[in-house]
Amino acid sequence: ISPNDSPCFENLQDEVDITKLPIPHHWPQDRGRYVSASVIIAEDDGVRNMSFHRQFVRDKNHLVVRLVPRHLRTMVMAARGQGRKVKIAIVNAPDPVVLLAAAMSFDDNVDELTIAAALHQKLYGTPLNLTTMPNGIVAPANSEYVMWGNITMEDDDEGPYVDITGTVDDVRQEPVIEIEGVAHRNNPIFHALIPGEAEHKTLMGLPRSPTIKSAVNEVVECLDVHLTEGGCGWLSAV
């Protein structure tokens, strides 16, 4: 739908300053304030990816993003090899089907936003409303907050950060995001998840249960899968 009709564009920051957003400092051991529940939508060379990645607030218009060795890191490294930045949108508090699709891991040629749209149609009987950011990235129009910009050629320190196991993750050199614009709904609600708590474990573990069940069924009949509390909802299953 048109940006003019999109709730996420009801308010636009005159001057980019992400430090004014209600982004929490979750644990005392963390490096600082972290975006923990936002979804990054990236497009480059005709390929789109939508996924979760924590983001450290470095300053008014820069984040440092932890990219684990999955599709988005592959995209960024390929673009860097050709001297390109990667255009992105960062969406906060979209419809839950977007969160679920972004938490899944597919083959690199599967578009998570298309999966989210299919889930929305299946559950609600209506299309998922999408709109276009000023940099050309398509994102859910009903998100509470949207930011747009680029994953740059620069790296900076990311971490320490308390991760899903409750232990402190290492400091690494990770890509820097430059934010070009910020918009939000009227009376917006900023979605954050507490690292290592129930929502974190649900979003990481829930999409894995069907893949584990399918894999086990190739060897022996599997009735159900439970990701255990002892495995932090991620590292072990029965």
Mark where each language-model region is:
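Extended, highly charged
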Residues: I1-Y161, G166-V238
